[in-house]
Design a protein with these regions (language model features):
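Short, intrinsically disordered low-complexity segments
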Residues: 29-71, 75-78
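Short, low-order "capping/linker" segments at domain edges
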Residues: 81-102
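Short glycine-/aliphatic-rich beta-strand segments at the starts of folded cytosolic domains
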Residues: 1-12
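Long, contiguous binding/interaction regions
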Residues: 17-25, 56, 60, 80, ...
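Short amphipathic alpha-helix segments
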Residues: 11-33
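Short, low-complexity, polar/charged sequence segments that are solvent-exposed and flexible
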Residues: 24-29, 66-69, 91-95
Length: 102
């Protein structure tokens, strides 16, 4: 299972709320509704999720989410990134981290 992060940048959440919701709904479908929403201030948010979907297929689904004063990047992240995240995100990552014994 791969760890993905979708990071969104916008001028205001009020203005871009529908696009953020569309990104969240796409993540929910890809992750079977198992994801963590992270806020990084009033102009950016990110969603971490695990999925078996290949990166190219996942990225293609997010490329269609576009809007004025809104941008989004989606990428595969390393499992090691969890140690520097909030407790909620670290616990979620720990639950999904692949076992080295499988």
């Amino acid at each position: 299972m791969r760890l993905y992060v979708v990071q969104m940048f916008y001028s205001s959440l009020k203005e871009s709320g529908a696009l953020v919701a569309e990104a969240r709904n796409t993540v929910a479908a890809l992750s079977k509704k198992d994801f963590v929403l992270m806020g990084f201030g009033e102009h950016t948010a990110a969603i971490a999720f695990a999925s078996t979907e290949p990166e190219a297929n996942m990225r293609a689904q997010f490329e269609r989410i576009r809007g004025e004063n809104f941008s989004l990047i989606a990428f595969e992240a390393a499992w090691i990134v969890g140690g520097s995240m909030s407790k909620e995100v670290s616990l979620w990552l720990e639950r999904h981290q692949p076992s080295p014994f499988k």
